[in-house]
């Protein structure tokens, strides 16, 4: 078995990296990449990249750790970051959550930046319902219901039970594939 002390140390390191290093307080968001030399923000495609799906996935992991460690303040902080992230990542024109965003609003390097992916929405729904379950925050439940409606209206195949994985910005099926390199049993 793994030494409990190693597990404890790993949890501490991961919490610090996510909540104190990659989370940028002035932005209220988690960034994907920082300078390797000093953990500062970098003005490049990679340095400006925000992936709302990764951030929301990380926040429900953090909520789980907060519960495991008996740290309600950690849960509350994760919920606040999750709410800020989903509000930032939500497409106000067509609905759904963008795949990638640029923290300065510049053009994206990723051509798929405005696609709506199933896993981003599922991870977001988990974060929202978990946030509601652990804190009773009504905003989390409201977002969960909004996500639930969007997912079942857009990702569901009306003929066969498996969801489509990739939608265009307008929420229309982009690829009729139901499985692939990224769409499998993990997501």
Features from the language model and the residues they span:
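Glycan-recognition and catalytic cores of secretory/periplasmic carbohydrate-active enzymes
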Residues: 1-187
């Amino acid at each position: 078995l793994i030494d409990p002390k190693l597990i404890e140390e790993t949890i501490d390191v991961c919490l610090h990296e996510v909540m104190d290093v990659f989370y940028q307080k002035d932005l209220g968001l988690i960034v994907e990449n920082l300078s390797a030399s000093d953990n500062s923000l970098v003005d490049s495609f990679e340095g400006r990249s925000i992936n709302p799906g990764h951030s929301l996935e990380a926040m429900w992991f953090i909520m789980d750790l907060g519960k495991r460690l008996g740290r309600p303040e950690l849960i509350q902080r994760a919920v606040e970051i999750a709410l800020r992230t989903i509000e930032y990542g939500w497409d106000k024109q067509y609905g759904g959550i963008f795949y990638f965003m640029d923290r300065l609003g510049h053009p994206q390097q990723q051509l798929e930046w405005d696609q709506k992916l199933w896993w981003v929405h599922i991870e977001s729904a988990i974060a929202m319902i978990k946030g509601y379950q652990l804190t009773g925050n009504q905003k989390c439940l409201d977002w969960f219901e909004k996500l639930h409606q969007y997912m079942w209206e857009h990702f569901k195949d009306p003929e066969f039970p498996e969801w489509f994985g990739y939608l265009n910005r307008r929420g229309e099926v982009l690829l009729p594939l139901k499985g692939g390199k990224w769409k499998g049993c993990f997501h």
